[in-house]
């Protein structure tokens, strides 16, 4: 995994400035760096390398094809590069052992159709020096980031927004996104970012820029298979689930550096641990964050069921309330945009611990809740389907309108704490998401995978891990596994009060009852606890600051009253206070 940057147009950043912009992302690629700068062509490509596969200097980027026509800058991993290389060997003379060269050869041979053959996470750009076409693409689920700015004259892209700003793009506030963040609690749900004019290429998309014509096209979307609800028995589903997951994990272990695992006390994480040890035949380094909290300390539970061998390679990062809050402002610098609170900071500290033990790659258990119906509110959607007698087939529903719930389906902030004029300006447009299925359950899962939960958490984890030069891999988001689980019959996801039914059935003989049977724990409970018991003074100071008082987004009197009630113990949702803190710190760092 690495950092990429590029520019195409009549007004390139000066070469020295372009290189400095690239090097704002040195943390993403501390092992090597390269640049292709051709002012006469109006093209610049830059790269910072984190060496994972083929550690030799032959993997240096930007990477040039044998005939010098194509130039690639690429971030990510193509897990099936070994198989693709065999398929391409008759057409391309390989000179390295990298997946980088395989990716470039695949594009040369198959053009944009190469994307259908790739298994992995990636964001890349290829410059065709003959046709003068810039081709850029992002993996199906948007695991790897791709931000860009295009003013109709010059196109600039990068792995992180900070690099775009360093290239000469002036930071400007996108008030519409600020409104959606405060009013609905949504962020990372669209192509727009908190910076006006800075966009993200959606997952499963590619773009072409030739001349001044920019075209973006989707090449993958779960909605493309909306009639494919699987008819499959529990027995056959178990076998296919096991086979797909084992193959995904096997591919995700392809690496020339050590691979570890982020471990929580949950079912998903422990499923990943079990299968990883089954596939590799050895115990691996695991990393957990341990919180000094009355509500939530997973390490106490993990310690109960790991065996002696596993415990020898289990690394616990002890975290206290003061340490995490002190890091909140630094996390803004890492993320470039508002982020998800104390859990994101805790993850960042865990990745720092992985760096201390020289484990360069970490597997993470993201995605099973979304693809197998694991969240509590999915039960409500499932029950709507049962009442109506639908199994997920049939005509699309159109769009889901989000009115009173935030991104985690918790009650959104009370509207009266927002400035009435600010609300009036932006509420007319509303906020809705494509709902391509007849099933309420599938549409809720689709929303979380394509728009809300997954894009958000993938951005958080990418930036949090890469600041310490750690590569996060997510085996549950192998697109084959995602498609299989998503289109399972609903009864294999939810039965009465049980969720992720198939997973629990598969793992029954492998995972301790203490893991399989426990209720899902919310990290938000820690945030609420610590805000009341540790952060009251800091929060009060920030909300009474001159800069915060000048913000036009708040009804300050109503907000002060609600915050006061929160500190007195009313309500368990602390997200609205986090919105105040996070947005204010971000505005000070990037906009003021």
Question: Whereabouts are the PLM-identified features?
Answer:
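A Lys/Arg-rich helix-loop hairpin that forms a DNA/phosphate-binding surface
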Residues: 93-95, 472-474, 550-553
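Core structural elements
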Residues: 451-458
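Cysteine-centered catalytic environments shared across enzyme families
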Residues: 1-330, 347, 514, 581
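ATP-dependent adenylate-handling active sites, centered on carboxylate activation for C-N bond formation
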Residues: 8-14, 37, 90, 129-156, ...
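A general alpha-helix detector
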Residues: 1, 83, 87, 163, ...
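Polar, surface-exposed loop/tail segments
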Residues: 35-37, 98-102, 499-506, 518-528
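Structural motif
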Residues: 93-98, 113, 168-175, 435-448, ...
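PAPS-dependent sulfotransferase catalytic core
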Residues: 511-570
């Amino acid at each position: 995994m690495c950092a990429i940057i590029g520019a195409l147009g009549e007004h390139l950043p000066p070469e020295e400035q372009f290189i400095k912009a690239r090097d704002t992302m040195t943390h993403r690629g501390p092992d090597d760096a390269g640049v292709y700068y051709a002012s006469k062509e109006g093209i610049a490509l830059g790269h910072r390398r984190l060496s994972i596969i083929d550690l030799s200097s032959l993997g240096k980027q930007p990477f040039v094809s044998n005939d010098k026509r194509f130039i690639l800058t690429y971030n990510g991993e193509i897990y099936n590069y070994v198989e693709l290389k065999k398929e391409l060997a008759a057409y391309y003379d390989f000179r390295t052992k990298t997946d980088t060269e395989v990716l470039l050869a695949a594009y040369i041979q198959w053009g944009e159709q190469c994307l259908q053959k790739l298994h992995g996470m990636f964001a890349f750009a290829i410059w065709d020096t003959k046709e003068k076409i810039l081709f850029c693409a992002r993996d199906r689920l948007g695991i790897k980031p791709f931000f860009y700015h295009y003013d109709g004259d010059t196109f600039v892209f990068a792995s992180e927004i900070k690099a775009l700003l360093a290239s000469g793009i002036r930071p400007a506030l996108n008030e519409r996104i600020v409104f959606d963040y405060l009013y609905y609690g949504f962020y990372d749900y669209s192509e727009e970012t908190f910076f006006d004019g800075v966009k993200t290429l959606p997952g499963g998309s590619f773009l072409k820029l030739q001349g001044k014509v920019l075209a973006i096209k989707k090449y993958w979307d779960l909605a493309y298979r909306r009639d494919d609800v699987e008819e499959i028995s529990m027995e056959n589903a178990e076998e296919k689930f096991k086979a797909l997951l084992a193959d995904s994990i096997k591919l995700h272990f392809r690496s020339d550096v050590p691979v570890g695992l982020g471990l929580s006390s949950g079912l998903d994480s422990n499923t990943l641990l079990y299968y990883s040890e089954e596939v590799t035949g050895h115990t691996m380094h695991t990393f957990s964050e341990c919180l000094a909290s009355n509500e939530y300390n997973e390490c106490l539970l993990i310690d109960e069921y790991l065996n002696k061998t596993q415990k020898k390679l289990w690394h616990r990062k002890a975290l206290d309330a003061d340490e995490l809050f002190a890091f909140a402002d630094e996390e803004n610098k890492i993320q470039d945009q508002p982020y998800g609170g104390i859990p994101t900071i805790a993850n960042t500290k865990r990745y720092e611990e992985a760096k201390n033990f020289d484990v360069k790659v970490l597997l993470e258990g993201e995605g099973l809740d979304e693809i197998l119906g694991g969240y509590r509110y999915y039960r409500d959607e499932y029950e709507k389907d049962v009442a109506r007698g639908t199994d997920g087939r049939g005509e699309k529903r159109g769009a889901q309108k989000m009115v009173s719930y935030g991104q985690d389906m918790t009650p959104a902030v009370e509207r009266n704490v927002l400035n009435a004029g600010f609300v009036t300006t932006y509420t007319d447009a509303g906020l809705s998401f494509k709902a391509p299925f007849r099933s309420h359950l599938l549409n809720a899962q689709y929303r979380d995978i394509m728009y809300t939960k997954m894009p958000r958490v993938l951005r958080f984890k990418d930036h949090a891990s890469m600041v310490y030069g750690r590569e996060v891999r997510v085996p549950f988001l192998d697109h084959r596994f995602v498609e299989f689980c998503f289109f399972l019959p609903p009864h294999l996801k939810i039965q009465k009060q049980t969720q992720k039914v198939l997973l629990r059935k598969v793992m029954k003989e492998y995972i301790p009852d203490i893991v399989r049977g426990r209720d899902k724990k919310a990290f938000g409970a820690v945030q609420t606890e610590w805000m009341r018991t540790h952060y009251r003074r800091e929060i009060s100071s920030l909300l009474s600051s001159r800069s915060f008082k000048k913000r036009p987004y708040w009804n300050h009197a109503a907000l002060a009253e609600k915050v006061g009630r929160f500190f007195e113990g009313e309500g368990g949702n602390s997200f609205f206070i986090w919105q105040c803190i996070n947005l204010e710190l971000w505005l000070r760092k990037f906009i003021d």
